[in-house]
Structure formats: C-alpha cells, structure tokens
Amino acid sequence: MKKIITFLISSLILMSSNIVNAADKIVFGTNWLAQGGHGGFYQAIADGTYKKHGLDVEIMMGGPQMNNRPMLIAGKLDFLMTGNLLLSFDNVRNGIPTMVVGAFFQKDPQAMISHSGQYSNFSDLKNAPTVLVSKDGQFSFWKWMVNAHGFKDE
C-alpha cells in the first residue's frame, strides 16, 4: 500500500509541474531595412513578448542587397513580410506553396508627393516632366492612373 501511495504522489507531482520546453525558433524576414513600420516586431524581441509566448524570433532585414523572397522558398526564413500581395499572387501563379497569415496595414501605404503649389490634382500631375513611381506602385495604382487619368508609360 505504501508503494501505491508513493507512486500516486510522485505521479501527481510530475503531472502538476510545469514542463519547460525550448522556445520554437522562428526566422522572420522583413521587406526592407529596419524602419518605423517594423518597430513592433523589434520591440517584441526587446521586451520579451515573443519569449513569453514560447517563440525564439530572429529578424532578418531585407534591403537593397538582400532579396528575402528566395530565402523563404529555400527554407532559410519561416515568415516573410512583403509590401503587398503581389508576391503572393505571383507565387500562386508559379506554383510556389505560399500562405498569407496576416495583414498589418489595412491599405498599402503609398503616396504621390510634389513640391507645394506645382500640382493640385492628377490632371496637373499628368503634365509633369517626370513622375517617379515605385516598383510596387507600377503594378498597382499606376495602372489605374494610366487608365483613369491618361498618364503614359514613357
């Protein structure tokens, strides 16, 4: 009887103790060098939020000499931040297994900027000698500007 009670007490102690597991290692790639919009990801490392939730997160910055997209496909990254859904659509088109797991901006934050007083609407801007548009913009809002406002690819 003493052996049974000892076994039961030992079992209860083992079952009630917290089992410490190693944190899940995750490598997260950003779409550019560290900037304000990425701040929360870095803050979660600094203040221990990821560790608190069982994650060991490493952030791999993107940038002018770093294309993180192939790193995701090669398994060097677990998650990748992109500027918009165009890369995800392209991955689907090319049969690359991709899953979108979160959207952090409700809209794709892009802007057209000019010096004060030169251009007050799209019709004025159409007459500008040069309009510089980001690569992402060329495949999203620029197509709308060409169709709706008569801009030209020149």
Enumerate the language-model features and the residues they cover.
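Sec/Tat signal peptide C-region and signal peptidase I cleavage site
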Residues: 18-22
